[in-house]
Amino acid sequence: MTNIRKSHPLIKIINESFIDLPAPSNISAWWNFGSLLGVCLILQILTGLFLAMHYTSDTATAFSSVTHICRDVNYGWIIRYMHANGASMFFICLFMHVGRGMYYGSHTFSETWNIGILLLFAVMATAFMGYVLPWGQMSFWGATVITNLLSAIPYIGTNLVEWIWGGFSVDKATLTRFFAFHFILPFIISALAAVHLLFLHETGSNNPSGLTSDSDKIPFHPYYTIKDILGLLLLILILMLLVLFSPDLLGDPDNYTPANPLNTPPHIKPEWYFLFAYAILRSIPNKLGGVTALVLSILILAILPLLNTSKQRGMMFRPLSQCLFWLLVADLLTLTWIGGQPVEHPFITIGQLASILYFLTILILMPISGMIENQLLKW
């Protein structure tokens, strides 16, 4: 009798994806983040489901319902904080995952890479709408400022914003539809993630050397299942340390004040994982220019395959490109810091320089370094 694991139509798919999957023998811990993202997604869907059972998407009661979850619902506080901090862990894993892809040249798998970019946009949209739901001051003003950016689109901008709002300002209709979208998007993300995996398994995984690993494969289970469990335990440890010791560390104190359209907070800023993009947006004095730069800061990932000038796939043996990559990481950290600062001197100038450096590094310096390294190979 054939093993049910290899013959059953459904179990066979799981087997080919997580058990008998041929994996390169030399992939490092940087390849752990894909499975961690899957765990984060499942965690967010489960905690979100329980939160949705007690949450009300009405401007009059939304803030109170979140307070009710924290005070009166059994273990409501831990579910709420696991969901809020789970989003932060999700983005940490996402940034590491994308960074790994850039460093080791994974963008040569164009379908997998492009679906990954779609996933990034979907997760960012979900996180933004989720931040609006508690209906605190930063929720309301964040929603107002970010949705208002669409009014920069010529001709249709104003109509588009009012259509998204469902009125002439962020109000009950906006909150209700954001809740609906926030609920449905994670399931769309799950479907996209399945397609992401499907395309990845068509080509097989990349590895640190950037060379083909067809001649040296090992089964995913037990080698990488045990390796992934270590990463998972570390993820849970960091998440639970955050949740149990300082659950509001990454949040904004303004969000503990109920939304008030008549009172603007002194510094409107999004969650920490959007600050780099927010800093790029603010660094351009023109509204349309800022919005364009904001979108391009993420969309630039889509043209990375076109900017790849090197004959080598990854950056493992390319010291010049490595320096530029870590310069880019430092630049993104600088942008994240600037995004959380008030709009005044010297932060404006630092933000503008960091924004220029971001695009300059990706569009010009990295392709040039690839060409230089190609020449060095001949020596």
UniProtKB/Swiss-Prot annotation:
The UniProt record lists the keyword DNA-binding: no
Membrane topology value: Multi-pass membrane protein
InterPro entries named among the record's database cross-references: Cyt_b/b6_C (IPR005798), Cyt_b/b6_C_sf (IPR036150), Cyt_b/b6_N (IPR005797), Cytb/b6-like_sf (IPR027387), Cytochrome_b (IPR030689), Cytochrome_b_C_euk/bac (IPR048260), Cytochrome_b_N_euk/bac (IPR048259), Di-haem_cyt_TM (IPR016174)
Cofactor binding notes: Binds 2 heme b groups non-covalently.
CDD domains: cytochrome_b_C, Cytochrome_b_N
Taxonomy, superkingdom: Eukaryota
Localization, UniProt: Mitochondrion inner membrane
Annotated binding of a ubiquinone, by residue: H201
Record-listed heme b b562 binding positions: H83, H182
Pfam families to which the protein is assigned, alphabetical: Cytochrom_B_C (PF00032), Cytochrome_B (PF00033)
Binding site for heme b b566: H97, H196
One term of GO molecular function: metal ion binding
Gene Ontology CC entries for this record: mitochondrial inner membrane; respiratory chain complex III
Other observations noted: Heme 1 (or BL or b562) is low-potential and absorbs at about 562 nm, and heme 2 (or BH or b566) is high-potential and absorbs at about 566 nm.
Known function: Component of the ubiquinol-cytochrome c reductase complex (complex III or cytochrome b-c1 complex) that is part of the mitochondrial respiratory chain. The b-c1 complex mediates electron transfer from ubiquinol to cytochrome c. Contributes to the generation of a proton gradient across the mitochondrial membrane that is then used for ATP synthesis.
Similarity comment: family membership: Belongs to the cytochrome b family.
Subunit structure as annotated in this protein's UniProt entry: The cytochrome bc1 complex contains 11 subunits: 3 respiratory subunits (MT-CYB, CYC1 and UQCRFS1), 2 core proteins (UQCRC1 and UQCRC2) and 6 low-molecular weight proteins (UQCRH/QCR6, UQCRB/QCR7, UQCRQ/QCR8, UQCR10/QCR9, UQCR11/QCR10 and a cleavage product of UQCRFS1). This cytochrome bc1 complex then forms a dimer.
Protein name per the record: Cytochrome b
Organism for this UniProt entry: Fossa fossana (Malagasy civet)
